[in-house]
Amino acid sequence: MINVFPVRAFRDNYIWIVHNQQFALIIDPGDATPVLTWLRQQKLQPIAILCTHHHHDHTGGISLLVQKFEIPVYGPASEKIPGMTHPLAEGDTLVFPELSLELSILDVPGHTAGHIACHGQNRLFCGDTLFACGCGRIFEGNAQQMFDSLQKLTDLPDETQVYCAHEYTLDNIRFARAIDPDNPELIELESNVEEKREQNMPTLPSSLAAEKATNPFLRCNQPAIIQSASRYAGRQLTDPVSVFAAIRDWKNNFRGNTDLPM
């Protein structure tokens, strides 16, 4: 049996450790220090590093970890990942016998040009593509790419557990409620998340079913989202990609409920 543990780093990063009683897979190690501390405390042997994209807060700890453990580094083939030994692209499958774990690789460009996600055993490690109630900023791709990447993730089973790389949930919910204020599942989620954050507990993993019900970026064909996006854009939007682009731009500039278009 494997477990997934969130090692916290920086202000709001989660470095996910997939492990059993002996071995560990390290996902997106932006900082080696908290990872080393946790591995030592748990007496675990790391077997590999897996990175979803090249941003430093996901890769900054690789060099020290590789220096200490001499383990392989997996990452997107089209991005410069420090020390990468195994470049990956959609269609590749990773097998870690020590963990009885198999992961399928998906290309999910948008946040970065070569961003990948990994799915296996009803777990999705999606880096900065999909967040709980949100999605990543579009730095290197375009709205169409990001929309397509998110739609690809929605094709996974509803019971999939979503392990994103940042604790953005509460801020994302506040934006989602500005767009979709009457969504009862969103209102309930906000209450549950506020309670967890008051106790300094992670709000992750989410589930794909929950995201489909509450995440505006996955619901761009829904009337409430279309209406709010059109009000923000100042014109009637008729296709989901335009709706997505509008609410992504809105989120980039969102400062609170006072931003709700009149």
From Swiss-Prot:
Molecular function in Gene Ontology: hydroxyacylglutathione hydrolase activity; metal ion binding
Entry-linked Pfam families: HAGH_C (PF16123), Lactamase_B (PF00753)
Keyword Zinc: yes
Pathway as given in its UniProt record: Secondary metabolite metabolism; methylglyoxal degradation; (R)-lactate from methylglyoxal: step 2/2
SMART domains documented for this protein: Lactamase_B (SM00849)
InterPro entries found in the cross-reference section: Clx_II_MBL, Glyoxalase_II_hydrolase, HAGH_C, Hydroxyacylglutathione_Hdrlase, Metallo-B-lactamas, RibonucZ/Hydroxyglut_hydro
Cofactor: Zn(2+)
Quaternary context: Monomer.
Entry protein name: Hydroxyacylglutathione hydrolase
